[in-house]
């Protein structure tokens, strides 16, 4: 059995987990998240803990038990604490402004780039060169952060562009005569 799948999830106070035939719902202060149930994984709830077991002895069911367990754990953490990603803008004149769930980027193009945030995702700019994306759904937070980064990814010679705050850019050496 999967090492991750063996570990139970402790359900904190204030979080309601409901297991139905076709989906698992997690409700908390951060909102409600749903996950489609996989027929290869059995979900058992007892004494404030969730256990995940493969429905049969196949390798696929074993792997899926760990995957589903981690997805549900991310849902529980998301509705209690939430997830956040930080992005930095590096470059002369690069700046960002957030207002009304919209992000306005000026990153060296002839026009500003506007990005609408989906429901459940909030964006803030602490400084004009720092973007903070927050939300309960880990996948959506990461996806929006990747889409923002893709507007102007860091280039390898000067490092200009939009990067994750913990990302290290390896700077290439320029061609010498």
From Swiss-Prot:
<dbReference type="GO" id="GO:0019843">
    <property type="term" value="F:rRNA binding"/>
</dbReference>
<keyword id="KW-0687">Ribonucleoprotein</keyword>
<dbReference type="InterPro" id="IPR000702">
    <property type="entry name" value="Ribosomal_uL6-like"/>
</dbReference>
<dbReference type="InterPro" id="IPR020040">
    <property type="entry name" value="Ribosomal_uL6_a/b-dom"/>
</dbReference>
<dbReference type="InterPro" id="IPR036789">
    <property type="entry name" value="Ribosomal_uL6-like_a/b-dom_sf"/>
</dbReference>
<dbReference type="GO" id="GO:0002181">
    <property type="term" value="P:cytoplasmic translation"/>
</dbReference>
<keyword id="KW-0699">rRNA-binding</keyword>
<comment type="function">
    <text>This protein binds to the 23S rRNA, and is important in its secondary structure. It is located near the subunit interface in the base of the L7/L12 stalk, and near the tRNA binding site of the peptidyltransferase center.</text>
</comment>
<dbReference type="InterPro" id="IPR002358">
    <property type="entry name" value="Ribosomal_uL6_CS"/>
</dbReference>
<keyword id="KW-0689">Ribosomal protein</keyword>
<protein>
    <recommendedName>
        <fullName>Large ribosomal subunit protein uL6</fullName>
    </recommendedName>
</protein>
<keyword id="KW-0694">RNA-binding</keyword>
<comment type="subunit">
    <text>Part of the 50S ribosomal subunit.</text>
</comment>
<dbReference type="InterPro" id="IPR019906">
    <property type="entry name" value="Ribosomal_uL6_bac-type"/>
</dbReference>
<dbReference type="GO" id="GO:0022625">
    <property type="term" value="C:cytosolic large ribosomal subunit"/>
</dbReference>
<dbReference type="Pfam" id="PF00347">
    <property type="entry name" value="Ribosomal_L6"/>
</dbReference>
<comment type="similarity">
    <text>Belongs to the universal ribosomal protein uL6 family.</text>
</comment>
<dbReference type="GO" id="GO:0003735">
    <property type="term" value="F:structural constituent of ribosome"/>
</dbReference>
């Amino acid at each position: 059995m999967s090492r991750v799948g063996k570990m139970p999830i402790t359900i904190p106070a204030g979080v309601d987990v409901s297991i139905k035939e076709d989906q698992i719902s997690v409700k908390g202060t951060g909102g409600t998240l749903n996950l489609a149930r996989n027929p290869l994984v059995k979900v058992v709830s007892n004494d404030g803990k969730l256990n995940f077991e493969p429905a049969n002895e196949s390798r696929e069911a074993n792997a899926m038990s760990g995957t589903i367990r981690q997805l549900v754990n991310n849902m529980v953490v998301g509705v209690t604490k939430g997830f956040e990603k930080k992005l930095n803008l590096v470059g002369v004149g690069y700046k960002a402004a957030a207002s009304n769930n919209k992000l306005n980027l000026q990153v060296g193009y002839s026009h500003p780039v506007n990005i609408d945030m989906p429901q459940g995702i909030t964006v803030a700019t602490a400084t004009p060169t720092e973007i903070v994306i927050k939300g309960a759904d880990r996948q959506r937070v990461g996806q929006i952060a990747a889409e923002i980064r893709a507007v102007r990814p860091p280039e390898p010679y000067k490092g200009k562009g939009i990067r994750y705050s913990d990302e290290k850019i390896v700077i290439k050496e320029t061609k010498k005569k």
